Regions:
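A short beta-strand-loop structural module common to alpha/beta enzyme folds
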Residues: 1-9
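Anionic-ligand binding patches
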Residues: 12-167
Length: 167
């Protein structure tokens, strides 16, 4: 597994779906070029949390995580997980999974407790559903695996379309 070194700054007026797709695509292409893996299939992805038309950041500090959680408290938001598969012949296939998540109203103590656990670090929207944040979620509509970061249904379909022997 490799990390792509790309600029992940959203472009001016770029909508969340377009941003997620662009990130997955650019990561796949960057990994192919940087690591000279043209002869291999490259699967890349990105998970984006959006509130309205706003793309929330990946929380790199407590203040950002706290801001994201306060914004999401008691609200619905979308988690967009885009994947891109680049084949050795240069074909690029893409899929996007969209999941709606609603947090329960969060108290300051709940936010503080979640922040103290550190699961938020590097996570889109400042939370990781596969950890204790699951207890903060009132409901989810869509793909749980997409919120974790790899939409399994879409990944399977993408690999099958590329000719992988999947039954």
């Amino acid at each position: 597994m490799s990390a792509a070194d790309i600029d992940e700054t959203p472009q001016a007026r770029e909508l969340p779906r377009a941003y997620a797709r662009r990130m997955a695509r650019e990561k796949a292409l960057a990994l192919c070029e940087a690591d000279a893996h043209e002869a291999y299939h490259i699967l890349a992805g990105d998970t984006v949390v959006s509130c309205g038309k706003r793309v929330l950041p990946k929380a790199e500090d407590e203040a950002t995580a706290r801001e994201c959680l306060a914004l999401l408290s008691g609200r619905r938001h979308r988690v967009l997980s885009a994947i891109a598969l680049r084949s050795p012949d240069g074909t690029l296939r893409e899929r996007l999974a969209e999941t709606v998540v609603r947090f329960k109203p969060l108290s300051a103590q709940e936010i503080d407790g979640y922040i103290a656990g550190g699961e938020w670090h590097g996570k889109a929207g400042g939370y990781a559903i596969q950890g204790s944040a699951e207890g903060l979620i009132a409901w989810i509509s869509g793909s749980h695996s997409a919120v974790v970061g790899l939409p399994l249904f879409e990944t399977r379909a993408l690999l099958k379309a590329a000719g992988f022997p999947i039954s």
